[in-house]
Structure formats: C-alpha cells, structure tokens
UniProtKB/Swiss-Prot annotation:
<dbReference type="Pfam" id="PF02601">
    <property type="entry name" value="Exonuc_VII_L"/>
</dbReference>
<dbReference type="InterPro" id="IPR020579">
    <property type="entry name" value="Exonuc_VII_lsu_C"/>
</dbReference>
<keyword id="KW-0963">Cytoplasm</keyword>
<dbReference type="GO" id="GO:0008855">
    <property type="term" value="F:exodeoxyribonuclease VII activity"/>
</dbReference>
<dbReference type="GO" id="GO:0003676">
    <property type="term" value="F:nucleic acid binding"/>
</dbReference>
<comment type="similarity">
    <text>Belongs to the XseA family.</text>
</comment>
<protein>
    <recommendedName>
        <fullName>Exodeoxyribonuclease 7 large subunit</fullName>
        <ecNumber>3.1.11.6</ecNumber>
    </recommendedName>
</protein>
<comment type="function">
    <text>Bidirectionally degrades single-stranded DNA into large acid-insoluble oligonucleotides, which are then degraded further into small acid-soluble oligonucleotides.</text>
</comment>
<dbReference type="GO" id="GO:0006308">
    <property type="term" value="P:DNA catabolic process"/>
</dbReference>
<dbReference type="InterPro" id="IPR003753">
    <property type="entry name" value="Exonuc_VII_L"/>
</dbReference>
<comment type="subunit">
    <text>Heterooligomer composed of large and small subunits.</text>
</comment>
<keyword id="KW-0269">Exonuclease</keyword>
<keyword id="KW-0540">Nuclease</keyword>
<dbReference type="GO" id="GO:0005737">
    <property type="term" value="C:cytoplasm"/>
</dbReference>
<dbReference type="InterPro" id="IPR025824">
    <property type="entry name" value="OB-fold_nuc-bd_dom"/>
</dbReference>
<keyword id="KW-0378">Hydrolase</keyword>
<dbReference type="Pfam" id="PF13742">
    <property type="entry name" value="tRNA_anti_2"/>
</dbReference>
C-alpha cells in the first residue's frame, strides 16, 4: 500500500533538495523586471521571460550596493540562490548581485544621475561662467605624478610665462577619490586669488574615471565660484564633470590653452598694433593742425594786418563822439542847476545873502568851466595819441615818408637772412611798386 506524505513533509523535502543541490545554490539568470514597485527596505518583484515568471527578493543591504535604480521592464542579469517558502510552497530567487543586461551598471547609473542633475539645472548654460583673458593664478586639481600636471605646466609656461600654477594633489580614482576631488575644489574656492580652476586626469576605463561621475564631484564643480575647466580622460570620454564645468577640454594641453586664451605673443602683438594706431592718429592730427596753420598764414589778416584795426578805429571815433556829447550834456545840466539855484537865492531875499550866494555861484561856474575844459583837453589828447599810434601801424604812412616795403612771395621781408641771389622781390613805394631781382647779398653781423 503506498505511503502518503503530508504537504508540509513534501515541502520540507523539496526545500532540503533546493538547499543541497549544487546547481541551485548559485544560479545565473537573465530576465525582465516585472511588477516592480520600490519599497523602503527589501525589494520584491518578478523576473520573467516569454514563457515563465519567477519571484525574486533583494535584501536592502544588497539593493543599496547595486549602483543603479531598478525600473519596470528593465532586462537584468542576476546571481542568486533558490529559496523555497514553506507556508505557501512557492519558491523565489534571493538576489546577491545584479547588473543591467547588455550595458553596465555604471552606464545606467550615469544616465540616471545625469537625468536627475539635469532636471535640477546643474548643466544649464545660463549658469556657465566666462573664463578670464589674463589669469594670474591657475588652480589644478589632479594627481601630482601624472602626465596631466606636466602637460599643463609646460603649456602654460610656453603660452604665458609668469602665470602661477597652484596644484592640489588629489586622488583621481578608487575609493575616496570623489570626496577628495570635491574637498579640493571647495578648498580652492576659499582662496581669493585663483582666476580659473582645472580638474582632470588621464584616460582610462569607465571605472577609472568614475570619480568624476560621482554626484559629490559634480555638485562641487557646479557650486564653484571660480570658473572650472574639466579635462577628464580622452577626447571620446565624457563625464558628468564635463557637463557641470564651465568649459570642457579634450586634453590637459587643451585645458591649459583654454585657461590662457591670450598668449604673451598675442598680447605683445596687440600692444604693437595699438602703438601703431596711436602713431598714425598723432601723425594725422599733426598734419591736420599743420594744414590749418598754413591756411591761417595765408588768410587776409596775416597778409593785410591793418584790417585788424579798422573796426577798432571806427569804435574809437564813436566813443569820441559820445564823450563830447556827454561833456556837453553834463555842462548843460550843471548850468541849468546853477540857474535853478540862482532863482532860489533870489527868492530868499536878504540882499547880502543873495549877493554872497551869487558870488559862490559865479565861482562854482568858473571852476566848473575850468574843470570841463581840462577834462575835454585830456580826452582829446588821449584820442589823438591813440589815433597816432594806430597811424604808425599803417603801411601807407611808412611809404609816404620815403620808405619802401620789401616783400617776397607776398610776405614782408624784415632781414637779409633767407634772401639769396636771383631772388625776385617786390618793393612797395608811395606811388607804385617795383619788381626787382637780387644781384648781390651783403649781410651784416648783428
């Protein structure tokens, strides 16, 4: 007669077989994530393909070390063990390790972190800072022994000698590298004299470059008040640090060139151009004023200076007439005032007082006449002197006295200096002018 087993007995037997079977102690599965809903601690979901579904469990400690976020429909490769749950008689896979199928976990983590930080605005162009044209000090966050720092020093020294490089020796890969990079970026920002900051390292695998994809590094770059140039890996490598930096350089040499956009030779050439422009401007200005001076010397005032006084002579005549008119008016007013006083005196009547006042009035009248005559004579003499002074400047008066005025090319000649034999001169005389040719020049020592 057959022996019937209880459900629990069979379940325990199957569990023992699962646990002792070497093929089930460590299984390698590939499948698509299904029914995933993230929970605070342990994660429970399904792994399926076209024909079957298996329940899987990831304990919280393992899930936190995955390095990427599980998503519904994601195809993953897992390593785990089979476990049977006795109360329900169901089995599941306890995952010990997982990674995306076809693409590494780091690549998934890269895209997920890129999306997260991008949505926060860390990569937007509006936050990018411009690089200085003439830096005095350049900070470098990199390994002290790699080729990066040597290339940067060589390039900067060649392009603009005298620029100081401040090195922050930094671990650029492995555990703790991201934290040290971020710390040194913040340390550099404590200085007020750094103009630009270069962070970078040489080429390597995605694992080697991963410190520059860490969130801590990216946020430190974004928060830097000093403009940051990222130079990580080779030209084909791209890190999140490149997106957050103000500028990205393909090589350390290119980073040094970005940090020194103007070379010493460029600056010297620019200064030479400015000097040439200034020289041309000064030369043009001198030519302009020289031309103006030539025009002035050919003007009527210089060729006929007597015209300069015509207006003044006319004004002097007008002033003379006004002066005479004022004297006459003043004399008439005073005379009228005296008459008024005489009438008042006559109206007061004692005779003696009237007589005394009449005498005083007569004396004042004589004094007034005398003063008016003196004033008039003085003004007339002053006008005469001014007229004679102006007449002395009149060339027609000079030639009227028997002198001649010598001109060369319509310019008055005051000395024999500058006169050579066969020069043609013009002699202005009282009744005409003579055109003469110099036959001999005899100069006197003065």
């Amino acid at each position: 007669m057959p022996e019937y087993l209880s459900v629990s007995t069979l379940t325990k037997y199957l569990k023992m077989k699962f646990e002792r079977d070497p093929y089930l102690e460590r299984v390698y599965l590939t499948g698509q994530v299904s029914n995933f809903r993230r929970r605070p601690n342990h994660q429970y979901f399904s792994l399926k393909d076209e024909k079957a579904v298996i329940q899987v469990t990831i304990w919280s400690g393992v899930y936190q070390k995955l390095g990427f976020e599980l998503e519904e429909g994601m195809k993953i490769n897992v390593i785990g063990r089979v476990q049977l749950y006795e109360p329900s008689g169901s089995y599941s896979i306890i995952i010990e390790k997982a990674e995306p199928d076809g693409i590494g976990a780091l690549a998934i983590q890269f895209e997920q972190l890129k999306k997260k930080l991008g949505e926060e605005g860390l990569f937007q162009d509006k936050f990018k800072q411009s690089l200085p044209q003439f830096p005095k000090k350049i900070g470098v966050v990199t390994s002290p022994s790699g080729a990066v720092i040597r290339d940067i020093i060589t390039t900067v020294s060649r392009r603009f000698p005298g620029v100081e490089i401040v090195l922050y020796p930094t671990k650029v890969q492995g555990d703790g590298a991201a934290a040290q990079i971020a710390d040194h970026i913040r340390l550099a920002n404590e200085r007020s004299d750094l103009d630009v900051l270069i962070i970078g390292r040489g080429g390597g695998s995605i694992e080697d470059l991963w410190a520059f994809n860490e969130e801590e590094t990216v946020r430190a770059i974004f928060e830097s008040r000093i403009p940051v140039i990222s130079s990580v890996g080779h030209e084909t490598d791209t890190t999140l640090a490149d997106f957050a930096a103000d500028r990205r350089a393909a090589t350390p040499t290119a980073a040094a060139e970005l940090a020194t956009p103007v070379t010493k030779l460029d600056l010297l050439g620019h200064l030479q151009q400015q000097e040439n422009r200034m020289s041309r401007a000064i030369s043009n200005r001198l030519s302009y004023y020289r031309e103006r001076l030539n025009k002035l010397t050919q003007s009527v005032i210089f060729r006929q200076p007597e015209r300069l006084y015509d207006g003044h002579l006319q004004k002097l005549d007008q002033l003379n007439l006004r002066l005479k008119q004022k004297i006459r008016e003043y004399y008439s007013e005073e005379k009228q005032r005296v008459k008024i006083l005489q009438h008042r005196l006559e109206a007061l009547n004692p005779h003696s007082r009237v007589q005394r006042l009449q005498e005083q009035t007569a004396q004042l009248e004589r004094l007034l006449r005398s003063n008016m005559a003196v004033i008039y004579d003085n003004k007339v003499a002053q006008v005469r002197r001014l007229s004679e002074a102006l007449l002395m400047l009149d060339t027609s008066r000079i030639v009227a006295r028997g002198y001649a005025i010598v001109q060369k090319n319509q310019k008055v000649i005051e000395s024999s200096a500058g006169i050579e034999e066969k020069d043609e001169l013009t002699l202005l005389m009282r009744d005409g002018q003579l055109e003469v040719e110099v036959k001999h020049v005899q100069r006197k020592e003065i």
